[in-house]
């Protein structure tokens, strides 16, 4: 894919919040790029549900449809996507360096939105499973 190197806004993170932010910026007429280290949009919440959950609730198809809808919304709103890109440096002036299997790319933007989300890190301690 041939990317422009300069954008009005770059969003780091293609989860629900990042996609929403990118859509809002695009609707205001900005040229937007969304960067994510995953192979598609959706974020951590769609990464890997427990197998027992998928078997009981058959949610994997629904989650794939949500990812497809995210991607369709981004494409329809002329938002560039850089999937499988890991951000390794953000310099003053919003110079964003990413890398993937093809090498390093430097992007620049007037605005930067960091929507990388979160995931739980369990730190066990005595009594940590006790309610209250």
Model-derived segments and spans:
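FAD-binding core/adjacent interface of flavoenzyme oxidoreductases
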Residues: 1-12, 66-132
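Beta1-alpha1 glycine-rich phosphate/pyrophosphate-binding loop at the start
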Residues: 7-69
């Amino acid at each position: 894919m041939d990317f422009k190197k300069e954008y009005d806004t770059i969003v780091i993170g293609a989860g629900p919040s990042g996609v929403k932010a990118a859509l809002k910026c695009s609707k205001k007429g900005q040229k937007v790029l969304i960067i994510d280290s995953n192979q598609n949009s959706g974020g951590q919440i769609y990464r890997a549900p427990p197998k027992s959950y998928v078997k009981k609730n058959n949610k994997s198809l629904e989650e794939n449809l949500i990812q497809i809808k995210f991607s369709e919304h981004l494409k329809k709103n002329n938002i560039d996507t850089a999937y499988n890109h890991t951000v390794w440096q953000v310099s003053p002036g919003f110079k964003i360096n990413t890398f993937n299997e093809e090498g390093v790319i430097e992007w620049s933007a007037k605005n930067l939105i960091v929507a990388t989300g979160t995931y739980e890190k369990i730190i066990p301690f005595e009594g940590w499973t006790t309610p209250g």
